[in-house]
């Protein structure tokens, strides 16, 4: 409901008056306990926070609070430092205490919103950001927070506008420039993205050399992309149907890159950008065009060098995709070797249907003038299309968010866990994954099994990985019982995802469905298969393979 302008003015004056009164009361009560030296000490803490020395800032703020627990500015500073350290529970506690002390603190509400957004609670974060803006319409952290919600929920244009406004209010906060770089890159505004990242490097702390090296390599790659043609330009058929293998529950298709011979690629919705193996890159003559830093990942040493390449084209069935950026890295697969992974960005303009029962992949070109009916789009004919129609099935459409890293995240429910959880929907993962943090909760202890498993990750092989058995795993209105899951540290994923992921929905769950991906609208449709099309549940479980970050 929109209030009349005169009522809004009265409301804002009342809020400002209450805020002024609250500030006077706080100052009057704390004057004796807040000497001038405390202000100098807080400035030192703020300087440490800006310099990226979060531990030093935390210590200073804790010392100040030990002297005066009613020091609101120090409590807000401590919450902010803990947020930067990704100690989300502690950060939440101090932001909540600040609100209890001063309910009219816009900064406290903005901080609380930022913390709960990082945990993946979108509904509460929106409430807190809006409360902050009702108290102070120019609260930059709240403006940036709402902009990032737009980013995750695929309203990227609105995100860019919000971040630009936040930067105009607080041009010294490096995170806003970093986020703007991400949003601009998603909109294919590569020059603006590179400029934003370069500004971030100017004002950001120099404490994390690997992150700076990653960004310098990414900026070089963005500059390179800005000189190329339209990325992911589509040609060929409007609709293409092709078979896939699924020996380990991952859809493995045959593609051609740069017009060459057929190669084996995994269809990987757990990767934003496509990936090419080092060996295949050498064979087909694809060279690095930029590189820099190391990416954190599962397995081995926990990281791998970031190397960027560029493909003139990829042919998937009768669909032709031109100008495709890729990562180039070493692959560790032993039992089911592949040449690459086809990521979300390459498929972004295609409605992609993965039928695990028929082992058939259907690609339909997205028509910008329509909102596709995902229940029938699989049978929409293309020109000269003689393929047999597919049986219509009931299903449920699940809204997706897109993480900062570019992969799909949806809400799932696990019996015994009281809150909804954010899971990555990943066709490139053999098995479902439960994060170590979630597995450590008291209510999850009954899930843990005695057995161990071997996991192949982007950074190598992890041995003796804990296993869990999820009693009931639900997505939308559909539930599967007794789903095996690997228990893995997902912090490498969460450091770059923007909001917390509690697990990965892998092939051992998705194989029970026909799955339709509408990447542009951020929707996944799940259609349960008939029992006759479900793979044998008593078959040997394959080696687990996790997403290629």
How should these model regions be labeled?
Residues 1-13:
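N-terminal secretory signal peptides that target proteins for export/translocation
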Residues 14-28:
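Bacterial N-terminal signal peptides
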Residues 33-39, 43, 55-59, 63, ...:
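Pepsin/retropepsin-fold aspartyl endopeptidases
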Residues 49:
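Polysaccharide-binding and catalytic clefts of secreted carbohydrate-active enzymes
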Residues 66:
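Rossmann-like dinucleotide/flavin-binding elements
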């Amino acid at each position: 409901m929109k209030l009349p302008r005169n009522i809004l003015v009265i409301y804002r004056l009342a809020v400002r008056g209450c805020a002024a009164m609250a500030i006077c009361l706080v100052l009057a009560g704390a004057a004796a306990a807040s000497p001038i030296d405390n202000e100098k000490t807080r400035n030192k803490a703020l300087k440490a926070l800006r310099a990226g020395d979060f531990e030093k800032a935390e210590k200073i703020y804790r010392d100040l609070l030990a002297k005066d627990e009613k020091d609101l500015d120090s409590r807000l500073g401590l919450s902010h430092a803990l947020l930067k350290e990704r100690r989300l529970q502690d950060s939440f506690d101090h932001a909540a205490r600040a609100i209890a002390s001063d309910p009219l603190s816009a900064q406290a509400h903005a901080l609380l919103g930022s913390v709960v957004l990082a945990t993946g609670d979108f509904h509460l974060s929106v409430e807190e950001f809006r409360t902050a803006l009702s108290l102070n319409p120019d609260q930059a952290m709240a403006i940036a927070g709402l902009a990032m919600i737009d980013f995750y929920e695929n309203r990227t244009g609105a995100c860019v506008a919000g971040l630009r406004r936040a930067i105009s209010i607080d041009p010294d906060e490096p995170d806003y420039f970093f986020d703007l770089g991400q949003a601009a890159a998603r909109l294919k505004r590569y020059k603006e993205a590179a400029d934003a990242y370069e500004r971030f490097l100017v004002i950001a702390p120099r404490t994390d050399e690997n992150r700076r090296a990653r960004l310098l390599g990414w900026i070089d790659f963005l500059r390179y992309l800005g000189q190329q043609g339209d990325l992911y330009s589509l040609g060929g058929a409007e609709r293409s149907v092709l078979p896939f293998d699924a020996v380990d529950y991952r859809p493995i298709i045959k593609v051609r890159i740069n017009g060459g011979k057929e190669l084996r690629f995994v269809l990987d919705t757990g990767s934003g950008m496509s990936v090419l193996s080092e060996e295949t890159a050498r064979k087909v003559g694809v060279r690095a065009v930029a590189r820099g830093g190391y990416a954190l990942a599962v397995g081995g040493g926990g990281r791998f060098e970031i190397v960027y390449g560029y493909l003139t084209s990829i042919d998937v069935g009768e669909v032709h995709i031109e100008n495709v950026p890729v990562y180039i890295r070493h692959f560790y697969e032993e039992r089911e070797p592949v040449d690459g992974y086809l990521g979300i960005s390459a498929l972004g303009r295609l409605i992609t249907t993965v039928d695990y029962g028929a082992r058939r992949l259907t690609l339909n070109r997205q028509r910008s003038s329509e909102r596709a009916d995902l229940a029938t789009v699989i049978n929409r004919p293309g020109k000269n299309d003689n393929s047999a129609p597919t049986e219509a099935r009931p299903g449920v459409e699940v809204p997706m968010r897109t993480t900062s890293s570019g992969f799909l995240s949806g809400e799932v429910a696990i019996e015994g866990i009281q809150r909804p959880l954010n899971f990555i929907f990943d066709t490139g993962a053999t098995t479902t994954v439960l994060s170590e943090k979630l597995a450590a909760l008291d209510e999850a202890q009954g899930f843990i099994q005695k057995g161990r498993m071997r996991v192949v990750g982007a950074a190598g092989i992890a041995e003796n990985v804990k296993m869990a058995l999820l009693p009931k795993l639900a997505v939308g209105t559909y539930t599967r019982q007794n789903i095996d899951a690997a228990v893995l540290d997902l912090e490498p994923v969460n450091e770059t995802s923007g909001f917390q992921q509690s697990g990965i929905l892998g092939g051992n769950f998705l194989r029970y469905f026909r799955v339709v991906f509408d990447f542009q609208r951020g929707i996944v449709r799940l259609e349960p298969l008939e029992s006759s099309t479900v793979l044998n549940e008593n078959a040997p479980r394959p080696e687990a393979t996790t997403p290629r970050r």
